[in-house]
Amino acid sequence: MYTIKTILKEILGHLPKVDFKEVYAEDLYKRLETEKDADVKKLLQDKLYTIQITDEIKSVLVAEKVKEVAGKLGYGLMINQSKTAYLYNTVSWEMITELDLKHFLSNVFQRMGADKYTAKNVRIANKIYEQACYSLYNPAENDKDIKINLNNKTLLINDDGTVSEREHSADDYFFYALPYDYDPKAECPLFYKFLNEVLPQKDVQQVLKEFIGCCLNPSIKLEKVLCCVGTGANGKSVFFETMLRVLGEDNVSSYNINSLCDDKGYSRIMIKNKLLNYSSDFNGKIWGNGIFKQLASGEPVEARRLYQEPEMVRDYARLAFNCNSIPTSSDNSYGFRRRLLIIPFDMKIDPDKADPDLAKKLRAELPGILLWAIEGLKQFMLNGKKLSPSSTIEAMDQEYKEDTDSVVMFLKAKNYIPDSTGKKKLLDLHREYKEFCIGNSLKPENKTDFRIKLQGERYKVEKEGTNKAYMVGVSNSIPSVTSPFVSPT
């Protein structure tokens, strides 16, 4: 796979010098050669004489010729709706900066016959570029197939979990390639040994495998942010470095979660066409704003390059981060919590037994680790595009709720449980909840959000009676006990 510079040089070398007028009026020239009638021939000559080849016409001819020659050589050029240019290098599409493309098109113009000073004129260079934005326009819409791109093959993951191998195609619109070859017989015994040491719970390993598998295809809807939690010397850093190389360093970014969620959007544009944004050391508070939820859900999000207009980005990295403890947030809603995929790295590695070169040794097993990730992707699809259940992770989620959600804290403190036979007015329960929050310096939810959260915790809330008041199906899990020291009255 050649570099962009090498490919552009090759395309340039195959462009012929042309007479722009002959190319533009090709049909008239052909007719003139075959015409026998002198009067008609004279009319054709007069017509050709009056044709003026403007800069606009030359711009069209340059853009169309570049597209034609690139295609014949097995390459491709396209510009999308955001005016971002890409070059197909026979394996994947790589971005070309606007300035590099302008210089290339200027060289093409000169190669095709323009004099040096005309070709280098800024006005004309800009005109050719604007024409290229039209002639090379391609929205590059991906199909719905689940595919993975490597150096030597493209893999198609079928609905039944089987894997098919295909040759590379520009029409797949891959903007990445894993930096190694596919080997269906590869193994990774050292990686499995590492996983069993740092994540002995098999249910957790399975979910982690499925998440990494989903990172291999950005079009999969997952709506999860990986949160690897644990204090030092527990394998998080080795896992981070290994995933960095499995997915390819060029395909992974490491921007701080909160910088991705700010209003400016400069960091967000940098995760466009990446497979994963893995922040290796995040310890703090996640901004509770809508941008985090958008990013976690893979929804279109506004981003911008410095000094440029904002654009809507659709294909961007999944999010992951390592942290010593579960992060806090001003948003304690279910919608926020459900997007966090908490993986507990709670096994301490004995410093005397730790291998400082383990991450380097695991590089030799990348094709095998890829097969591990593909197995996770296949299981995710067989699950109906859902992560496998994990009692360990569910327990972590419940603990997180009890530590961050005032409604869940209240229910736990009062030993309340859902019970369709027990009834309590929502108004009374909410008043009791507010008193609990005041006593514990917590910000209470309003009555509507309180009701919604109760329903989220599987409490039945319905309007009953003649006044249609909301009633909650709730009871106390610890029955009251009469003290043996008090005589009944």
Say what each PLM segment does.
Residues 1-82, 110-489:
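Feature primarily recognizes SF3-like P-loop helicase cores of small DNA viruses
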Residues 83-88, 92-106:
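Trp- and S/T/G-rich repeat-edge/linker motifs of beta-rich repeat architectures
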